[in-house]
């Protein structure tokens, strides 16, 4: 049986931590664990997911929940409540529902104070890892039999009815993920006609019916070239000389978005080496199976720009294709011949220096799973027996997650982000005395997860920004500062600092709070908006060079309304407690941030969400930021427009339901389901509360709260519904903890802001 291990790791030559592995979450298979009854419940959960996989595609993340609730002997002892038709919500009913949610959620806290959860969803995360392990000869050691079984389960569970796989679990089938999933199945031992429900045959038919893998997007062309199932001459150039360009040029690594930089860093190394893995009998078979013509007869030069229409979200502009063609025809032939190949060798050396720097400063976690696999493979190409590659191997478990739909690869984990939101939700419940241990543990996790230092050495030369005082998305070992993660964690620390230490633990040292403020202030742009990782400011026209076909806005840093709002809320609270610290800068930040939020409002009154689905998500953040400075419906036109948008999109059942299609389409799309989405309902409910809706007309709030209460499950949990996370416009993320955090938080804010406080015996 699979078991989740928390904060486990043993320092050695290849594995080390900056904070004793706080926040680390790894899965291990124990063949002797679990009773027959426990194993039967897991199988029941797997079967239930399989039977309903086309109805609700995100899993309910049940395996670790079953484990934690069992280990803590949790039983819901608070009676369930429902709001009948025509019945008003009493303070007692709201209190009972809230307490049930809080007691259940508190039982899910890990021993180190965070809440584990899946953060995955894209279907291109896992196959490259399997391919990398196959190429390097570590497949069977990294993925023993039970791992392979769960990986295949995941692939089967998320195959679409037409035989393909989407870019993410709710998406339409794409060539990229269908081909990668097919290859993954074949590497893991399935035959060309094998797999559950003829998975391989159906996938291959989809591939051939849609033009074969010559139409795979650029990332797919790169991975297939590495594997030996495509030819490098059929890819667009990724010259490593990019890393030795003079800094005054507009196209320079220092001006790139950090994710783009750290992905194309190892990718350009592998391209510069023209690395190809061993050509095994399986690779030769794939060359036959994936094409609708003989492999040796393919005109590779003509397929560089070919991309299946199902994958094409961002068509390359003419100027970009012209650049690729110029590099392909003129530059590459020179750089691969003497004497210019000396420059190529120098570029490869510098590129690998940057790869090692990023690896070391993230404890070999890297920024995320896409970079992780590419950097790991680059290290192996440099030295198959070297320490760098072995350190990468030691961190693979940090990315793997097991649920009832199988084993997948996470982006990097969302431990700090989830914990900060969870703590604020619990504090809003005003149950501090009852959940003191939960709050203490959560507070301790937040304090121990703060990044204590800047990147090593002369980090600016390595294109890095300050990180001391920040919080990463996952844990301290990751080390990468994120503005909204920092702001939300700072809010928690400030809230805790005003509470009795015997209830929530000792407050954080003010100096460390100042460090957090320094990071936040450093990331504001001239337009008042806040970027996520590093300061924005590179020319917008560089986005014309976006080399991907299925993402948008990946070349440079951009400002985000969510990050800006989080920072405003944190700094307003900070200013009240520390009015003398960098007063002018804090005031200017807040004023400019508010102006940015007002400036980027959509004509319909909403805001576009960059990290959640979509206009409802961003509207909740924006209204929270405006409310923090005293702006409401009565004194702010932007708030009035936003309220009109939210009330206009409220559904007949009292909730809200926004389709993920809003994100790529950039217009509001309603869910095509009869039911509303509870997470989005909570966002809208809290946004309206921020606006002052309770003083105008509380009826929309009552209707929303009724929906949340009536959908609560017997044990205090809430059901998993549609996916609610997103990145880069077009790819969705499943944050499995959202279904607990936000309905709980929404009910808590409703109870303390809408209902008249009364005391009741609710048990």
UniProtKB/Swiss-Prot annotation:
Each PFTB repeat, start to end: 148-189, 513-558, 590-630, 639-680, 701-742
GO cellular component: lipid droplet
InterPro entries: SQ_cyclase_C (IPR032696), SQ_cyclase_N (IPR032697), Squalene_cyclase (IPR018333), Terpene_synthase_CS (IPR002365), Terpenoid_cyclase/PrenylTrfase (IPR008930)
Keyword ATP-binding (UniProt): no
GO BP, one annotated term: triterpenoid biosynthetic process
PANTHER family from the UniProt entry: DELTA-AMYRIN SYNTHASE, TERPENE CYCLASE/MUTASE FAMILY MEMBER
Entry annotation: catalytic residues: 484
GO molecular function: beta-amyrin synthase activity
This protein's name: Delta-amyrin synthase
Function, in words: Multifunctional oxidosqualene cyclase producing delta-amyrin (48%), alpha-amyrin (18%), beta-amyrin (13%) and 4 other minor triterpenes.
Catalytic reactions on record: (S)-2,3-epoxysqualene = delta-amyrin; (S)-2,3-epoxysqualene = beta-amyrin; (S)-2,3-epoxysqualene = alpha-amyrin
Top-level EC class as recorded in UniProt: isomerase
Keyword Isomerase: yes
Pfam families named among the record's database cross-references: SQHop_cyclase_C, SQHop_cyclase_N
NCBIfam families: squalene_cyclas
Organism encoding this protein: Solanum lycopersicum
EC number(s) recorded for this UniProt protein: 5.4.99.55, 5.4.99.40, 5.4.99.39
Family in the record: Belongs to the terpene cyclase/mutase family.
Keywords: Isomerase, Repeat
Expression across tissues: Expressed in the leaves and in the epidermal cells but not in the inner tissues of the fruit.
